[in-house]
Each structure stands twice: as C-alpha cells, then as structure tokens.
C-alpha cells in the first residue's frame, strides 16, 4: 500500500509541476521502497529533478533520511546523465553521487565530466570530491582539458580550487604504463610521469622524456618546465647525454 501511495505522490507532482524546494521524480516502471534501509529503487527512464541536480538513468537507487524527497545519495546505472546546480555535467554507464559530501564517482567506457573550464574523460573511472577540491581519473586512456593544457595518461590525480567562479588546477600527478602527454599552445611534452605545481609554476617530467617546440625536439630522462614563460631544462640521469633534434626544413 505504501508503494502505491508514494507513486501517486510522484505522479501528482508530475502533473502539477515542480516548485522551488521540491523534488520531482518520474519513472515508467514505478518505485520499490525499502523503508527500513531508507532507500528506494526506480526503474526504466528515470528522471529526478531538484534544486540541486537533474539526473536521468535506466535504474536509480536513492538513499534518503527524513522522507523520499530528502535524497542524500544516489546510485544510478544505464545511460546516466547528471547536471548539478553549479553547471557540472556528467555522463557515464554508472554514476554515484553523495549530496552530503559532494562526492561523485563516474564509471564507464566513455565516462565524461564537464566542470565548465575543466573537462575530464576516461574509459574507466572519474572521481570528483568537490568539498575537498580533489579529482582522480583512472583508465587505459584518461584525459583532462583545462584552459591552458591538455593532459593524457592512464592515471591523473590532482586538486583544484574555485577562484572567481573558475576552477583552477593546483596540483597534478600524471602517470602512464606507456607515455603521458601534456600539450600547451607552444609545447608538447611526453614522459612516463609528470608532476605539475601551480604554486611553483613548474611541470616536471620523469623518464622517457621528450619536449617538442616548433622544429626542436629534446630527449632525456628528466625535464623541468617553467609554466610562466615555458622555458625548460632537460637532463639525463643514466647516459649523461641529452639528444637534440632540429628540423631545419624550409616550408
């Protein structure tokens, strides 16, 4: 009887239309409520609209506290699309979101999270902890795009902060089983591992290092790049030699 009662509430909200402070939920195959465990299941073409977020998915498991509309955590699967009140947009095969902790875990072969000036893509997993300003991307191919850089690697870990409504990267650690790639307007940087510090305005490259600028290619074991003027130094630990290739071909 409770399931029917709650479902009637959902349908009545859909007819009346959502007002500020309300949560509107629509689903084609109804709702299954687990009152003791404080969660409910929504199946097939689920749409949840609230002041904080809009989410659509094939299946949603919603955890609540006081009542069904007091949603604290969501676990969603199948064609997930999520938009927050801050303008963040997430797409994935599975997406878990905690309203209490502002923690999002996005899974899928084409997982995507768009934070306006920060765009994250992965073929496996993206994590955002918005309360602490931390993020993680894990997969065979993970990609982070900012206003000034494009970063590709298997593992991308970092932190960010919001300054004047813009998310700025503070720190980055990029690793890859193959080669990481960092691209700016004037430089292409390759290595097995890369570390970025906004405080020091430095990018460090470790192992299998290659730095390309215009027709110049420098190869070594370690590089240190100043992000303000993009000057750099490349060194070699083992061979004590740095290889420089210059293409002087006239166009």
PLM feature spans:
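Mature-chain termini and adjacent capping regions
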Residues: 1-251
């Amino acid at each position: 009887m409770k399931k029917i009662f709650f479902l009637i509430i959902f349908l009545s909200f859909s007819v009346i239309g959502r007002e500020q402070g309300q949560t509107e939920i629509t689903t084609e195959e109804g709702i299954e409520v687990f009152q003791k465990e404080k969660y409910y299941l929504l199946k097939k073409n689920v749409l949840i609209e609230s002041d904080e977020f809009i989410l659509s998915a094939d299946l949603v498991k919603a955890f609540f506290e006081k009542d069904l509309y007091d949603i604290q955590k969501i676990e969603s699967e199948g064609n997930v699309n999520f938009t927050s009140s801050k303008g963040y947009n997430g797409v994935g095969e599975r997406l878990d979101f905690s309203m209490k902790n502002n923690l999002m875990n996005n899974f899928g072969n084409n997982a995507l999270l768009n934070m306006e000036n920060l765009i994250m893509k992965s073929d496996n997993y993206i994590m955002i902890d918005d309360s602490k300003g931390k993020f993680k991307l894990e997969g065979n191919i993970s990609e982070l795009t900012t206003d000034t850089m494009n970063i590709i690697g298997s593992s991308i870990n970092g932190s960010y902060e919001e300054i004047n409504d813009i998310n700025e990267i503070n720190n980055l650690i990029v690793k890859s089983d193959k080669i990481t790639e960092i691209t700016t307007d004037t430089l292409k940087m390759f290595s097995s591992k890369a570390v970025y510090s906004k405080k020091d305005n430095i990018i460090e490259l470790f192992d299998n290092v290659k730095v390309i600028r215009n027709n110049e290619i420098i190869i070594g074991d370690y590089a240190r790049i100043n992000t303000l003027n993009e000057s750099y130094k490349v060194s070699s630990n083992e061979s004590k030699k740095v290889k420089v290739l210059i293409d002087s071909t006239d166009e």
